[in-house]
Amino acid sequence: MSRLTLLVLLVIAAVIQKVHGQGRENEKKNEHEPGNQDGGNQNEKTERNLREPNRQTRRFNTRNDNRNRNIMQKRAMLLWQRRMNQRSNQNNFGNNRSIPPTNTFNRNRSRTKSNKSEVEKENGSNKASKGKMQSGDGGGNGSEKEGPERRKVQHRIAKRFQKRHPSNSPKPKPARKTTNQQYRRHFMNNYNNKYWNWRRNMLNRRRTSPQHYQNQQARWRYYRYGPYTWYRYKNKWRLVRYNNMYRRNIKTNQSKKSNQNNQGD
């Protein structure tokens, strides 16, 4: 009797379990639907956030920060470079020559403003505005005489009034120095020259910090564009300003031990 009751109880338990399990399956099947409030997977959101970044998402997360940093860096370097070019343009050599569209831009410009009365201007006797001579009383040089139109000839300004070097044209380069001239006191290959020996030592020294930066002229100019620091990348020194220092992409540690709050560096 006892065996029979045990068997019946077991069968009943199995049936109940099966039915209950089916109900759970149905509940699970519907858990993602909008009407279902309970039975949803509570960890779904955090799982989505902890997903291992693939190539595309990693690129997307990193891109904006790097772009911002690069733009700032380029802008500061360009400002500094433009200043350097302004300084070195007076010695026109190398790639620093600025060649304007024309040499003779300021040459024949009228140097005095016309202080004529309005009556004269109404009569058209302001000669600077007239490109051609006109017959009759129209104005220009030949306004008294009647006759065919003649081209207005503009003579060169007297040489002593001329600018030798108009501001926009490059100065002529002097001829190359002869051999005995170029080994003068300050020339680089003159080994008695303290300045160049110091610089040569600098260039040959293995630099692990940017303490002595070669370009002396540049040294004091970097500071104008905000606080900065040098860092070594691909065996070259690069410049980063402090306002960009904290904008780097966050390193995520994928191990199970890491916290959700890990902010990288």
Curated annotation (Swiss-Prot):
**Residue span of region Disordered:** 20-71, 88-183
Extract the coiled-coil ranges from the record. none
Q: Identify the keywords attached in UniProt to this record, alphabetized.
A: Secreted, Signal
According to the UniProt entry, which residue ranges have a biased composition of type Low complexity?
88-98
Tissue-level expression reads: Nacreous layer of shell (at protein level). Expressed primarily in the mantle with highest level in the mantle pallium and lower level in the mantle edge.
Q: Which residues form the signal peptide?
A: 1-21
Specify residue ranges for compositional bias: Basic residues: 152-166
Spell out the GO cellular component terms annotated for this protein, sorted alphabetically and separated by semicolons: extracellular region
Q: Where is the composition biased (Basic and acidic residues)?
A: 22-35, 44-55, 115-124
On the tree of life, the source organism's domain of life is Eukaryota
In which compartments does the protein localize? Secreted
**What protein name applies here?**
Asparagine-rich protein
Q: What is the lineage of its organism?
A: Eukaryota, Metazoa, Spiralia, Lophotrochozoa, Mollusca
